[in-house]
Structures are given as structure tokens and as C-alpha cells.
Amino acid sequence: MESKLSFESFFYNESKKAYFQKLMEKLDEEYEKYQVFPNKKDLFRAIELTNFATLKIVIIGQDPYHRKGQADGLAFSTRTKILPPSLRNLFLEIKNAYPNFSKENGNLENWAKQGVLLLNHVLTVRKSSPNSHKNIGWEVFSSNLINFIVKNKVDIVFLLLGKKAKLAVKNINLEKQKVFAYSHPSPFSFAKSLKNSMVFRKINDFLKEKKRLEINWNL
């Protein structure tokens, strides 16, 4: 049964729903009137790069980076040379768990290809306006995507970073999954619980326990 399921099949079914069509219409207007991130071609990059059959981890963020050139369609990832503070703190926490960690850029594409779904709860944002695309339909899309995963998979690692990520799964049954919940890596909240949590090692320990390939965070 699972072999027939894919993110492509999920997207095809979702795209026929009324809320999704309204969301796409709204986004057409937004892209026409404002600078919106990420680029349209990168909107669904998270589910394009990660294979449902080999999915291991779901990392849930809030909404994309709102400065020009930063957002690339993957939560926390960026193509810019200068790392946004949240990503810099994530890397600090990985280095805390793996002292030899030395990733030189913020492009997390290879995490996605290893089975890490990097999902923002809201997938778009206006330039310099965080939360500007709240309640236009993305929350429904993200919740439906997470439900699709938990109904068809077990032992998926969910890393929830921040209050909004926790709210994203509030009404979803994650009993058959492995959940890690910590503060957001932003400078304002990093130290609350994410810092020194060793969560990236804990994730790999869990994968190892389940006899699955560990994630190489350096890639």
C-alpha cells in the first residue's frame, strides 16, 4: 500500500480542493502586487526534493525568511552566503552534538534528499513582513500534509521548533511517531530549550535504533 503513496499523489489530490484553489488565486494576486518569498518555482520544493518512500524526519518551522534572497522553499535553508541567525543557531546546536560538524553554507537541499522534510507551517511571506501570509490557506495545506504522513507512516521523527510548530500539530495524533519539541532557534528563544539539547544526536540515535540510515548533517 505505502509504495503507491507519494508526495506527488498527495499534491494532486490537494490541488483539486476548493481551499487550495483559493489559496493559489490569492498568491497570484500577492506575487503581482508585492515582493513575495520564496520564488514561485520554489513554493513546493520541500515535497519535491524529499521522497515520501524514504522519509525519516519532519522539521517544522514557522514561515519563510522575509529578506530578499534568503528563502529557498525549504524551512531554515538559504542560498545566501551569510547565514540567518536561526540557521546559525541550528548549526551551533549540531556542532554541540557533533564537534567535527563544519557545513560551509546554508543550503539544506542534501538534508531533504536524505529524507528530511523541511516544512514551514506557512509557505510564503511578503518582503519584510513576517506572518503576512498567515490564515490565507497554508495552515490547512500543512496540516493536511502532516496528517497524510502520520496516517501512512510510523516512527517518523518530528522536530517541532517553537510555539507555532507545536500549534501546527496540536490536533494531529503523533502517538506512533517520535516527537522532539524545543524552542525556536531564533536569537530570542534559542537558549530556552533548544540550546544544548543534543537533539540532532538524539535523532540519529533513534534512527540507528530503528536500523535506518543516520542523517549526515554535514552534507
UniProtKB/Swiss-Prot annotation:
Gene Ontology annotations for the cellular component aspect, listed alphabetically: cytoplasm
Keyword vocabulary terms for this entry: Cytoplasm, DNA damage, DNA repair, Hydrolase
An example Gene Ontology biological process: base-excision repair, AP site formation via deaminated base removal
Molecular-function GO terms, alphabetical: uracil DNA N-glycosylase activity
Compartments where located: Cytoplasm
Enzyme Commission number(s) from the entry: 3.2.2.27
Species whose genome carries this gene: Mesomycoplasma hyopneumoniae (strain 7448)
Catalytic residue positions: D63
Function: Excises uracil residues from the DNA which can arise as a result of misincorporation of dUMP residues by DNA polymerase or due to deamination of cytosine.
Catalytic activity: Hydrolyzes single-stranded DNA or mismatched double-stranded DNA and polynucleotides, releasing free uracil
Family affiliation: Belongs to the uracil-DNA glycosylase (UDG) superfamily. UNG family.
Entry-linked InterPro entries: UDG_fam1 (IPR002043), Ura-DNA_Glyclase_AS (IPR018085), Uracil-DNA_glycosylase-like (IPR005122), Uracil-DNA_glycosylase-like_sf (IPR036895)
Top EC group: hydrolase
Annotated protein name in UniProt: Uracil-DNA glycosylase
Pfam families: UDG
